[in-house]
From Swiss-Prot:
Designated gene of the protein: cfoH
Protein name per the record: Cytochrome P450 monooxygenase cfoH
An individual GO BP term: flavonoid biosynthetic process
CC terms in the record's Gene Ontology section: membrane
GO function terms (MF aspect): heme binding; iron ion binding; monooxygenase activity; oxidoreductase activity, acting on paired donors, with incorporation or reduction of molecular oxygen
Cofactor(s) needed: heme
Amino acid sequence: MDTTELTQVEGSMMAVTRLATHPVLTFFAILLVAILLWYMIPYFTSPIRSRRGPLLASLTNYWRMYHAAGGSMHLVSYALHARYGPVVRMAPNYLDLDYPSLISTCLDSHGVWKKTEWHGISGVKLGNKVLYNIFSECNPAEHAQIKKPVAKYFSSTGVSVMEPHINNVLAFFVKQLDDQFTELAGFGKPLKFDEWASFYAWDTIAQSTWSRRAGHLEHAFDFDGMVDTSARVMDYLVTVGMQPSLDRFLDKNPIFRIGPPSFVPVANAAFNHLTKRRSGEDDHDPSKPDFLDCYLDAMKKYPEVVDEPRLMSYILVNVAAGVDTTATTLRAIFYLALKDRRVWEKLEAQILDASFTKLPVSYSQARAVPYLEAVIRESMRLWPGSCFAQERYVPPGGLTLPDGSFVPEGVAVGFNAYVIHRNKNVWGDDAEEFRPERWLQGEDESTERFKDRLRLMNSSDLSFGAGSRKCLGVNFATMEVYKTVATLIAVFEFELADPAREWKVHNSMFPRQSGIDLRIKRREGVTVPLGLDLGKEF
């Protein structure tokens, strides 16, 4: 090597040395190595490293966060199960399962399987503490304590006293639809049913909670911004919920809250009604108890559990969980049934043949229409109230899957209702199709065979969850939906404004459907208003 070459080599080595000792470059090199180690060590040491799924999903929760933010998690989950089978690794420590037979084990009634942290971010920060509600409390023992004081009010008997409240709002809903969307000569201007389903659900839950409508039906638009606020809160919960540690720096930030928009207007309204109820200033009818009456009763009977913050948490969960699930279900029922004229005409005929004795239709009479129940259950099968996975941590002892493989303690597993409800082993080869008849006994089907099939479908139904964490409001929501669908069809003729138009669905905490434009016409012989006290707006 001549002198020139030696000089070049020495120069290159000196340049490398200078780069290596440069503090900024050294910092970034160390940072890069640290990041690689941060992701790669858990990846190679994970007890579920052999499970199949997207590579990025096995490295970071941000993969799920990305799809959650885009509103397509249900479609992504379904596609991945079609590719990888019944077990898919969708996060570093999470397995998504398409095993309906494991629902009763993992979503148990004994509280052994603990909820994962993403459920907990809906807790509310009060001072230096976080108040968890009946949904967000992950500890099974604490959840049972919160649930016990109010459980009886949500039994089928308990919610029956709320039927007059639903009747009042339903009668007003019918009046508003008739005033704005019908004409004497026939069908009126298009009704944006996706929006009005939300308005109706908001007014119904407000009326049932504190005996006053929220005002959305009256104003015919999102006058206080709460429909939009609720949507953005739900977007935050499912997006940040995929990486729960972020919530400590956002919504639970001790210095400056950067979290989602709050339910302050609803909380203020609830507090005002609570104050007036206690002082005797409000004029609600005690013979028609509402949920606020129930919660005050629980406060008297369980003072060690139900203080004022806890009572407020019950009210806010009423609103957060009781509005969107109902609106989602109503949209799905009308859209799916109207898209299939055979189904719609059969449903319409059975409702009109029922000869209801009064309007709004009573819950007991609505439940007596077999095809109505079939349409409602089929709509909720395809579009359950939540299309995000219901997750639990595997308890001590682990979990053996039907294929014989083992999932160790501490790994999170879950079931996405959108996926489970399309499992062909349960619902048949046409599981992706809307066919209400699957809930009815076939002409050539034996009673025993139908009972077995129905039992399997019921045990696989996650429309309201399962086990000890099953939606507490299932009986109220069911009553509301049955009465509403039966009454609306008994009063109006419906048609799609544009039969060729497809709806759009954004999957947040609850599916948000849009683009459901309908035309309605009042049926001959029906008088509107329906002759009820139409209630009051707060």
